[in-house]
Amino acid sequence: MTKSELIERLAGQQSHVPAKAVEDAVKEMLEHMAATLADGERIEIRGFGSFSLHYRAPRVGRNPKTGDKVELDGKYVPHFKPGKELRDRANIYG
């Protein structure tokens, strides 16, 4: 599901709320989540999961075109860990 599809589905379920208000709310929520992670904070949504940053250590990679070795710097990457309720709901299809 894309962000546009999410907005469309939520707007369809909330007929009393204008679609533009739903779009603004979704965009604001995602922006706030990104800013929170950028500040190094963890986000926990009970029953759904948690978002945090994981550190990737510096390493030697390879240029896929030339095969040359490339030094890659260490960096933080977003990480999502699903909560138990979400894992259980997803496993009904597995």
UniProtKB/Swiss-Prot annotation:
This protein is one of the two subunits of integration host factor, a specific DNA-binding protein that functions in genetic recombination as well as in transcriptional and translational control. One of its GO terms (cellular component) is cytosol. SMART domains: BHL. InterPro entries: Hist_DNA-bd, Histone-like_DNA-bd_CS, IHF-like_DNA-bd_dom_sf, IHF_beta. HAMAP family: IHF_beta. This is Integration host factor subunit beta. Belongs to the bacterial histone-like protein family. The keyword Transcription applies. Heterodimer of an alpha and a beta chain. SUPFAM superfamilies: IHF-like DNA-binding proteins. PANTHER family: DNA-BINDING PROTEIN HU (PTHR33175), INTEGRATION HOST FACTOR SUBUNIT BETA (PTHR33175:SF5). GO terms for biological process: DNA recombination; regulation of DNA-templated transcription; regulation of translation. Signal peptide: none annotated. Pfam families: Bac_DNA_binding. Keywords: DNA recombination, DNA-binding, Transcription, Transcription regulation, Translation regulation.
